[in-house]
Amino acid sequence: MAKEDCIEMQGTILETLPNTMFRVELENGHVVTAHISGKMRKNYIRILTGDKVTIEMTPYDLNKGRIIFRSR
């Protein structure tokens, strides 16, 4: 996925799913399923319910995304 094709959005973690998947509610009200990016997994970044995150999505499938940043 090319970087310029991605859509970045802010959201909140609603629930944790198996295999490091999360249900995220975006600021516009949509709920998507997202997984952790490889660098976050490599550096053992913990994500809990209620955390504010930045996700990137492809314009081809707006129901799935990748968590790329966890806000403090």
From Swiss-Prot:
Domain S1-like residue range list: 2-72
Highest rank taxon of the organism: Bacteria
Gene3D superfamilies: Nucleic acid-binding proteins
Pfam families: eIF-1a
Entry GO CC: cytosol
InterPro entries per UniProt: NA-bd_OB-fold, RNA-binding_domain_S1_IF1, S1_domain, TIF_IF1
Record key words, sorted: Cytoplasm, Initiation factor, Protein biosynthesis, RNA-binding, rRNA-binding
GO molecular function, one term: translation initiation factor activity
Subcellular localization, as worded in the UniProt entry: Cytoplasm
Oligomer and partners: Component of the 30S ribosomal translation pre-initiation complex which assembles on the 30S ribosome in the order IF-2 and IF-3, IF-1 and N-formylmethionyl-tRNA(fMet); mRNA recruitment can occur at any time during PIC assembly.
Function statement: One of the essential components for the initiation of protein synthesis. Stabilizes the binding of IF-2 and IF-3 on the 30S subunit to which N-formylmethionyl-tRNA(fMet) subsequently binds. Helps modulate mRNA selection, yielding the 30S pre-initiation complex (PIC). Upon addition of the 50S ribosomal subunit IF-1, IF-2 and IF-3 are released leaving the mature 70S translation initiation complex.
Family: Belongs to the IF-1 family.
Record protein name field: Translation initiation factor IF-1
